[in-house]
């Protein structure tokens, strides 16, 4: 089953390496990874998407919670949530092609 795990962690050098290293040590694949600082400059939010059985995910979350840098961990797939994808595309088109591309983009509410 696919899981989305949100990790609030200390914004320090090596913190990301320790979290990702835990996945690597357990021979566990990370499908997506996103890291960004929070409003509090001392903290970062790491969002990881991975696939695994519930008991394996539970084991990984227990190990993650033991890391010194991890402040809070939430498995977002346990509750109701909204998922979105983002794609950046650069297109060079003129005239009729440009209009057709805009119409296609409008179908998907692209900007």
Set out the residue ranges of the language-model regions.
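A conserved regulatory-domain signal marking ACT and ACT-like small-molecule sensing domains
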Residues: 1-111
